[in-house]
């Protein structure tokens, strides 16, 4: 049974049991800022389990794309060297939100495994938590598993409820026992059942974990039963496929074998058992799906993890002898394997290929450059009789040049050496500490709120008269009262304030009554449907239960709405002008501008920018109404609505039709396109490989920008004594004149250098058969200095020369040495001798070198020392 069929049978089985099939969420978690990547099926349901995200269903099933690389859950270094570690994997799961519990969860699992997948019952073992008699009895008495194949696992991790068979969401919160199902590969494979000394062997393999969220644990460790008990299960598709396909390694299943063969093809390797091919096959899945979900290789956060995975794959290709790009060529093979299950992969195929190709090309340059630095450093260590490479240097290679530590370690091993990894770790820790110190956190992050959700009135109203204070926070802690002058976060039961979301900034405004005035500087989400008003109490005292008038800054909101609506029109126009591959990758919409990041691999031309502006302004002139509808997500997408990167959507979504644009959007917008007024793009540039950024302005901002631009054009025309319409022609004339004058000036400088060279030659002093000259050449630039040195070398035949010039407090130095003398006197060392005395440094070839300095006062003394320096070396 192929992996694709296994996935489909799982989802269809649970659908037949009343479960809603929920699409895989993004690998970038939308509901948990503490999590690097989505690493299990329950991540997208975390708020559902906590009761803060109501859904229209109580049973769900998913095939969730997951990544474990970076952060707490990091399998990267094991990938390719064990049978079951992956960076990317698919987690099959079924979930109950206060619906069924242990009986049905266990019964469903047994039926699917033994009836649908037809696994032999005698091959299945189960574990339960030591104290979970209920689960034990269900397995033994209802399902009929022999008691010798049911194993109780107690607290085996050194604390109460710390067990392989007891699951917790954190130190506090929902938790409960779990039961795990294992498959026995038979006595021909070494290993013992779970809980035995031989449990780490490969005979008994865990294939499914059923978690029963039964309790809530408080800060004191007390356990109370949850009013609504839930189920969260997870089964790795790759592990299950290995069992059903009768192989002992996940890399032997059909999906991986096809990718391994493809990796062998592009690296021109015939040995399909090579571990490097497994690494490459695994990594193409993780890298491709991360890029699909909007992650771009970078130097921090998720982008850095992606870059590390890409570079690890490239390094393994390099180890196989592949010296050119190859990794991006596997995207088409991955699409062939997984595109049917994940259409978003097929849609993004070209973009993923382009991003990987660019990253490869960049890193191959890094490998070549890094290897030269590393080889030089190792040669130096060997020359001194050492066996350990300095960890600080390894960190510099990693941090400055992107050279991975594991590659550095591999090269060292080949030379019989090691890396000082503790020193490397110390350097890395210092960098991380600096990064943490520089981090900023939103005022609402981490606030504990258990009340009702906020009712939002901001689509229709700019003020609400009877808003009640239901929560107050100062310095991250809940309080009953806020005093004048304190910064705080206020939660109301009703509000017209829009909380920052979907790229749109939060509203500003005022919360007030007769005795109190609270200035709202920002509005942020405390939870999905809970709005926090962050600001300062300017007057009075604010207490829980107070009733206030909540009023937004209507002028600021109107300007923000213009920019947000223009963003929708611009997004559509970009797709029309540049192509359907354009996909939003991020945005920031405030009262001043809209900033829009999108997938595209080339700078926009002036003509493309003009066409986008024209399309958007035509839509503005059409003055089309904005029409908002609420409908099921699937219906909206089928109807052509665009879902945007980084957004988490529920099952019911808000669809905005604005002119020719249709998008899912929860933000605030103009009533008609004409309200935008005028649209102008002011910035276009690149922010990462395959990602462009456009900034645009609207309304009075755009009009003011054009007026200021017009004024500058008129000023420039007046300065050049031309009409604005003649400006381009006049500038071309001036440029031609400047080029002609520069040519004349260069000729004059050359003549001057020649004449000065004749004079300077007479100042040279002979030392050991070599003429030594150190002098200042007034008014010369670097080019003139070089030409003069060349003429002097020709004239003097055997010479060591340093010429200097001073301009604007900066020293320029050129050193030249004739070939006969350069074995003993090197120009690079000579110029550095002078440069170090004038606050600079430099370098170059043995026969010609240059340097600069910032301390001209020491120049005469430095030049005077040249003769003695040369004499010492002859």
Curated annotation (Swiss-Prot):
One of its GO terms (molecular function) is ATP binding. Its EC number is 6.1.1.7. One of its GO terms (biological process) is alanyl-tRNA aminoacylation. It comes from the Bacteria. The keyword Transmembrane helix does not apply. The keyword Cell membrane does not apply. PANTHER family: ALANINE--TRNA LIGASE, CYTOPLASMIC, ALANYL-TRNA SYNTHETASE. Belongs to the class-II aminoacyl-tRNA synthetase family. Catalyzes the attachment of alanine to tRNA(Ala) in a two-step reaction: alanine is first activated by ATP to form Ala-AMP and then transferred to the acceptor end of tRNA(Ala). Also edits incorrectly charged Ser-tRNA(Ala) and Gly-tRNA(Ala) via its editing domain. This is Alanine--tRNA ligase. It comes from Burkholderia ambifaria (strain MC40-6). The lineage of its organism: Bacteria, Pseudomonadati, Pseudomonadota, Betaproteobacteria, Burkholderiales.
